[in-house]
Amino acid sequence: MDQNGASGSHPNRLSQGRGAHARERGATVSAAANRSNIIDEMAKICEADRQTFAIARRTRGHERLAVDNSDFVAVEDLILSYAEPTPEDQVEMIMSDFCSSPTYAEDEDEPSHESEPWFRFRNKRIRTYSRKRDPKSHKAVQNEKRRGSSGLSVQRDLNTSFTSMACDFDASSQKIHEVLLNLSQYFSATATASGPTPVPSQIDLPTEARQDSGDECFNAELENLRDDLLQSGFTFEASFYENEHEQEGPGTMADTIYGDSMQSVPTTRLRLESGKRNVWSDADSTLKKADVEIAENKKLLMGQTQAKNVDIEENTNFILEGIPLSEWLTPMELPEISKDVIKHIPDKKLKLEPSSQKEQKSSKDSNASKVRGASKQSCDINTKNEGTTILDQPNAAEQENLLNDGELLEEFLFNDWQPMQCSNGPSTSKNAIQGPKENINSINLDDKEQPEKQTPNKSQTISSHQLNGIRKKSFKFIEVSEEMKIKGEEFVDKVVSGLYHFSHKCNLRTEEYSDNHSQVMESTQCAEFKSAPSKPIEILDGKETYNAIAKVDVGEINGKFSPLNNDTIAEPEFCGFRTASNKAIPISEKMKIKTAEFMAEFQSKETIQQNDYLVHQPNDKPTSVGLDTALKRSIESSEEMRSKASKLVVVDTTMREPHQPTLDPVCRDLNESQFFGFRTASNKAIEITEAMEKRGAMFLAQSKATDQLNGWQPSDFPDVLPTSPNNEIHSINVENNKAVNTKTVSETEFFGFRTASNKGIVISENTKIKVAQFMSEFQAADASTDSNQPTVISEESRNIDAKFVDEAAAEDSANKPTFCNVQSLKNTSDIEHFKHDFFVEHSAKEEHPLCSQPLVRTPRRSQEIHSSLSQLAGKSPLDQATKKSVIARRNLLSLKRKRKIILSTETSTSCALPTMERFAPKPSSTSTPLADRDLNRSKDCTKNRQDAEDMSPICMQPKKSRRLGLSRSRY
């Protein structure tokens, strides 16, 4: 049984092993299949990722128009979107924004002594305004005081970087910061340790300007300029200061934004060439105090005293101290030796010697010229004091060569010349100078006896003392011709003799000056005049120049000094006018005759205008008066005009004597040519015919009659006008100083009104009837007012009144009756009836009790009232004239409406007194036309009101709300 069990168990084991192997194999196959599926999926994912990345690269830079179908996001996009910036990137961005320049490249060889950061202003110094640097020994004490200062101080944070300080403080904020620090330091210094900070009564701030800001001329600019000068090849001398840092003084340094201090530049000014020196004006130095400190430092360091000579150079602490940089950019000329300014000029005496003596000593061969300028004199200068002289030359030989006329006069300053008067030329001064005539004559004789000398060429030396002719400032000779020499001699003789002749009269006044000026007169001669740039002026020959100068000098001398002798200068008789150049205008006899005729005619015309005198002249055109026109054209005058002018003068004299009734026989001849009429602007007579005379008489008569008719009252008209059957009336007699009876003028009978142009207004029969009815009603109203009794008006009169009101309203429109002659009035009975009904008797007006009281009635002239209220839209409601017209128009419209209501009623009791209501006074009202305020209609209107829903918002009535305060509703 064991064998069977053993043999039976072996196939079972095989089957089990096969099953296990099959299961393992299936697991491996399934695992391999799963691996292949994962690889395929990864491949698909990579392919999708590749495609999405390619699409993202193509669409990068612009917005995607459509959303992706899948929700897949590329890894690169995630990295770029979620990457955080590093501190290095932020620093690079800030440096590129603020410290980079597109046109600037950094140097590779960066200097080691400059502090970071590097930016485009590396080689430039920023101007800063800092306080004075205190000595190093007191820095710790001041820092302790700052920590305990008051709340007004603004402390600088020591932990902040220099770059932030540069960004925070500019020029203006630095100045404010500095002022606050000074105030804080002042309050902290005055505070006591025990008690609180006391409040001082006043703050003693420094009044002088800051030395470190103006006097240092901005150390940054100085250093830059120093570098530029060193590059250009300039060299500076060694400094007198050995220890620069130890000898730092307060107020000489300035802090930069990087904390490093600007070192002083221990250099001196450049030494100029020998014979030249720097001359600076007072404006070049900015602060006097700095100059004093520099001078003291130099004395301590050098140990030597300053020499008296001005040529010794001043050594300064800085180069270009006190001189702005802008002044060095412009070229500057060094001052010449001859133009140096000497502040203390010693007293000098000028001794003038004749040039003839000098000429004999220097050169015997040279001869004096005939024409010699005023500068042809040599001068010796003797000084009293031992001070500096204007010219200091070592050799006497060089001094003799250089002291010629031109250079000698150039070396003198303008203020060195003492005022001195010379009598060798025309003088414009008021002081008379007298010189001996013998000396003058001797001078002239000597000049004439001297031989002529040739004009020097340009090749001659300038240092020679002799000069023939006139010389410019640039040492160029001017040739003088023989004619000019002769004219000059004659002119000098005339002027000198004339001056001597006139100055002899003032001998007593000028005795003290005779000795000095006699010497000058002997050695000086006047050649000719010179202009401002020393150019010669040609002298006119003849006696005109001499006479003009003599007259000027005589006038000046006679104006100041009274002559001893009673000799008067005979002036020529003057008759006429003078021009602007003081030239006499000759007046001939012909001009005198024309002027006399013109004055006679002018006086006669003026007399005629004043006395209203008419001169009759013939119609033919007379000749003109002999005067000159504006174009200097002569106007011929005839004998007839002269005779008329003489007659007019006689008439003028006779008219001024009213007590002599008889006229001169010459005036009787004027009746030959009678003149009656007017004249034109050109003095032409206007002929007046007989027809014009008749028209004028008719016009005067008619105007007088019109004035009388306008002045009459209605009660002054007579009942019947005297008329003839042929409709002819007599004109009114017009009296003008005498009764003039004019002849009767046949005209049509006139009765009615006239316009402003004297045209008749037509009055029709219908108008007459209406006016008569109107006046009857008016009289009836006045009578009823007197008796206070009601009057009954018939139905016929009411209808007529209604028609009259309607027609009157129609007449208010723009259509007005036309104007024409009053020829339609033929029946005199109608005229009498119209006049009788139109005018009110004067006695009735006096008996009326209400006539004396001003009544407000409807205006009678309805055509002057505005036809509608729309015409008042553009006018102000506050205008009084507009307000009155509105009230009058409203009263007229209400009158018509009431008349229609009264006429439409059946009973006559309701309208018992229509005339009283019509002419009754109306109460005053405002200019705004209001609606009808009938109490009976208000109740009916409430029933017919529409609901608010049915009405439009425009037509809806405003809701009345209760108003508080002082406001009132208008209605």
From Swiss-Prot:
Judging by the UniProt lineage, the source's domain of life is: Eukaryota
Work out whether the entry's keyword set contains DNA damage. yes
Q: Where is the composition biased (Basic residues)?
A: 130-139, 959-971
Enumerate the InterPro entries for this protein. Answer: BRCA2, BRCA2_repeat
> Keywords, A to Z?
Cell cycle, Cell division, DNA damage, DNA repair, Meiosis, Mitosis, Nucleus, Repeat
Is the Membrane keyword given for this protein? no
Positions of BRCA2 repeats: 570-604, 671-705, 746-780
| Region of interest: Disordered | 1-30, 130-155, 349-395, 420-466, 916-971
Stretches with biased composition (Basic and acidic residues): 349-364, 931-948
Q: Which GO terms describe its biological process?
A: cell division; DNA repair; DNA synthesis involved in double-strand break repair via homologous recombination; double-strand break repair via homologous recombination; meiotic DNA repair synthesis involved in reciprocal meiotic recombination; meiotic recombination checkpoint signaling; response to camptothecin
Q: Which GO terms describe its cellular component?
A: nucleus
User: Where in or outside the cell is it found?
Assistant: Nucleus
What PROSITE patterns does the database record attribute to this sequence? BRCA2_REPEAT
From start to end residue, where is composition biased (Polar residues)?
1-15, 375-392, 420-432, 453-466
**Phenotype when the gene is knocked out:** Viable but female sterile. Females lay weakly ventralized eggs that fail to hatch. Induced sensitivity to DNA damage induced by irradiation or treatment with hydroxyurea/ Repair by homologous recombination is dramatically decreased. Instead, large flanking deletions are formed, and repair by the non-conservative single-strand annealing pathway predominates. When combined with disruption of Hus1 females do not lay eggs and have reduced size ovaries with apoptotic egg chambers.
Recorded hits in PANTHER family, A to Z, give:
BREAST CANCER TYPE 2 SUSCEPTIBILITY PROTEIN, BREAST CANCER TYPE 2 SUSCEPTIBILITY PROTEIN BRCA2
Subunit structure, interactors included: Interacts with Rad9. Interacts with spn-A/Rad51. Interacts with cyclin CycG.
UniProt function note: Involved in and required for double-strand break repair by meiotic and mitotic homologous recombination. During meiosis, has a dual role in the repair of meiotic double-stranded breaks and the efficient activation of the meiotic recombination checkpoint.
Name of the protein: Breast cancer type 2 susceptibility protein homolog
Which species does the entry assign this protein to? Drosophila melanogaster
